[in-house]
C-alpha cells in the first residue's frame, strides 16, 4: 500500500510541476493560452480528487465522467462555481476559484497503458471554437498493456464560452 501512495504522490508532484512551469507564459506570442500557476488550495483539491492517473476509478466516482471507449476523451470547460459543483457526484468542499478571472478545464483521456505523462497543455482560440492541445510523453521502460485513464486539469485566464475540442499528441 505504501508503494501506491508513493507512486500517487510522485505523479501528483509531476503534474503540479508541469502546471506551474507553464505559469510564466499565460498568453504566448503563438496565440495559445497556457495554464496559470494555481493557488495551493486548488492543487491540493485536484491532487486529492483528480490524480493524474489511477486505476481505482475514485475520480470517476467523484466527477461526472462517462464511461469512455479506448482512446476517447472527455473534457469540460468550467466558467462558474455552479458548473464546477454540477461536475461532482458527491458533496466535497470546492477550492476557491475566482471564475470572473479564470476558467477551469477538467478532462479525462484513455490510453493503452500507464506509461505516459502529461508534458504540456495549452488552449488556442480558432474563430468560433477552441482547441485544447495536450502533449503526453511516452516514458522509458516497460509498462503492462492495461488500459489506463489519465485525468488532467488546468486553470486559465478567463476563456470564452466556445465549443472545445481536444488535440492529443503523444511524443
Model features per residue range: what roles?
Residues 38-39, 147, 151-153, 158-159:
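A short, surface-exposed interaction/processing loop segment used at functional sites
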Residues 19-49, 171:
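Bacterial Sec-dependent N-terminal signal peptides
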Residues 69-131:
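Mature extracytoplasmic domains of secretory-pathway proteins
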